[in-house]
């Protein structure tokens, strides 16, 4: 999947940039709008270019906690437990406030040399 995603976005030499991150959002938990990419050039290469989120929780076990993208026609993806979504790390995104239950996910970043 990573190679297809990298080719789709036109990136070469993709690699895992850091260890995977387990995230847990209990009731009231959220993560506001942000980009995963280092747009200010503060981090050493490899730079994040593709982000991936795997939903670990069963969607029936929590309410809210939608992964949203700041794009035209913003419609949150409806992931099932164990499904992954890949997206460009420069796209602003957030996790809405969890209203009930706990949302768990695994997040990974893939990158390569700095953009030219």
Task: Write out the residue ranges for each language-model feature.
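Fe(II)/2-oxoglutarate oxygenase catalytic core
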Residues: 1-84, 90-116
């Amino acid at each position: 999947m990573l190679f297809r995603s990298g080719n789709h976005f036109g990136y070469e030499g993709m690699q895992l940039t850091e260890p995977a991150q387990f995230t847990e959002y209990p009731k009231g938990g959220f993560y506001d709008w942000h980009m995963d990419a280092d747009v200010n050039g503060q981090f050493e290469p490899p730079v994040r270019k593709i982000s991936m989120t795997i939903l670990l929780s069963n969607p029936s076990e929590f309410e809210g906690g939608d992964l949203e993208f700041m794009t035209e026609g913003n419609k949150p993806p409806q992931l099932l437990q164990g499904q992954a979504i890949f997206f460009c790390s420069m796209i602003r995104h957030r996790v809405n406030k969890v209203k009930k239950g706990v949302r768990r996910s695994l997040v990974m970043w893939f990158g390569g040399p700095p953009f030219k």
